[in-house]
């Protein structure tokens, strides 16, 4: 939407509109999903005025009312599926990682969580006919896990046919056998991954707002943001809020953070991928005692929950633990130098 539209809302003059735009509220859709307290603080207006602005934005953007199931089905046809390039895992997910949803991948150290985030940051840039979304990725790195060298490995590890398609998508001419051409292609992939290191939970939450700005900036471009990754979602929250006395505060902040991530996914048709740490449940006498951090809040906010665990050598077991429309199941993949590969 044009920025000038904001001034058409009741209670929004030029000065207020400028404050809203400076804080990432540059379209009716972003205002429509805000809450009145957040908007009141951002624009320095009363909460009742903020509520009126939000309601007007919802009406203008046609957001927040009831819809028929047929309308919801039609809208869901716009949702993209991002491939893992592992048929077993893609089948498990009904075609791949969904846009407009939060997918949580949890597992112990070394299970391959960060490998998944790197591989999907590559795959999202592939043409849609090769399982990609022809989009860029935003990567919030809270554990210093992002390695451009790993992106290099994974791009070079694509099949020749996929490499050729990627070269066409990135408008690079040459042969897949030519080293200079491959280097140029790797650089093109890296240029479309926006990385920021989160130093603490507050900074991590701020970066989610910055991610929204990046998505807005590229919304109408040739390479829109189609994936937002947080690796790891819970590390800072777990370290900073210790003990039962601080659990409520931690969960409240985590809920706000997840809500912000969810908004980016919904507004910009992006897949939201978060990794999560685990802990052992000493009360579990049977089965796997490993459970994810984050409690019920993360459990409810994650549309898809996936559990990675180590197997022999480079094998990893990928288990779909929870999904609204899919049966639980398991698949096997390999973590190799060239990236994630089928068994």
Swiss-Prot record:
Report the domain of life of the source organism: Archaea
Swiss-Prot/TrEMBL keywords: ATP-binding, DNA damage, DNA recombination, DNA-binding, Nucleotide-binding
GO aspect biological process, one term: DNA repair
What transmembrane ranges does the database entry give? none
Record's SMART domains?
A: AAA (SM00382), HhH1 (SM00278)
Question: What family, per the record?
Answer: Belongs to the eukaryotic RecA-like protein family.
Q: Which HAMAP family match?
A: RadA_arch
Question: What PANTHER family does UniProt report for this protein, alphabetically?
Answer: MEIOTIC RECOMBINATION PROTEIN DMC1_LIM15 HOMOLOG, RECA/RAD51/RADA DNA STRAND-PAIRING FAMILY MEMBER
Report the protein name in the record: DNA repair and recombination protein RadA
Species source reads Halobacterium salinarum (strain ATCC 700922 / JCM 11081 / NRC-1) (Halobacterium halobium)
């Amino acid at each position: 939407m044009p920025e000038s539209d904001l001034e058409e809302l009741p209670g929004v003059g030029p000065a207020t509109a400028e404050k809203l735009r400076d804080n990432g509220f540059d379209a009716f859709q972003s205002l429509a999903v805000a809450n009145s307290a957040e908007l009141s603080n951002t624009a320095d207006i009363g909460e009742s005025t903020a509520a009126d602005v939000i309601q007007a934005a919802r009406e203008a953007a046609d957001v927040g009312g009831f819809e028929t199931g047929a309308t919801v089905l039609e809208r869901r046809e716009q949702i993209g599926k991002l491939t893992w390039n592992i048929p077993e895992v893609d089948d498990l997910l009904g075609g791949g990682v969904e846009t407009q949803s939060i997918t949580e991948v949890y597992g112990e150290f070394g299970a391959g969580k960060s490998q998944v985030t790197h591989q999907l940051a590559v795959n999202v840039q592939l043409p849609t006919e090769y399982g990609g979304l022809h989009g860029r990725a935003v990567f919030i790195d809270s554990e210093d896990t992002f390695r451009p060298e790993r992106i290099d490995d994974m791009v070079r590890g694509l099949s020749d046919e996929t490499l050729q398609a990627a070269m066409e998508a990135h408008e690079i001419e040459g042969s897949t056998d030519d080293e200079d051409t491959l280097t140029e292609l790797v650089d093109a992939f890296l240029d479309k991954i926006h990385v920021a290191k989160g130093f603490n939970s507050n900074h991590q939450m701020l970066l989610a707002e910055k991610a929204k700005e990046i998505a807005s900036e590229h919304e109408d471009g040739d390479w829109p943001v189609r994936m937002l990754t947080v690796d790891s979602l819970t590390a800072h929250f777990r370290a900073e809020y210790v003990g039962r006395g601080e659990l409520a505060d931690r969960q409240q902040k985590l809920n706000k953070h997840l809500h912000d991530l969810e908004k980016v996914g919904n507004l910009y048709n992006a897949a939201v991928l978060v990794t999560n740490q685990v802990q052992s449940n000493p009360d579990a006498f049977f089965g796997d005692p490993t459970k994810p951090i984050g409690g019920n809040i993360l459990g409810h906010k994650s549309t898809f929950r996936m559990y990675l665990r180590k197997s022999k050598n480079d094998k990893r077991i990928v288990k779909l633990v929870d999904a609204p429309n899919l049966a639980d199941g398991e698949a096997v993949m390999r973590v190799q130098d060239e990236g994630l590969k089928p068994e």
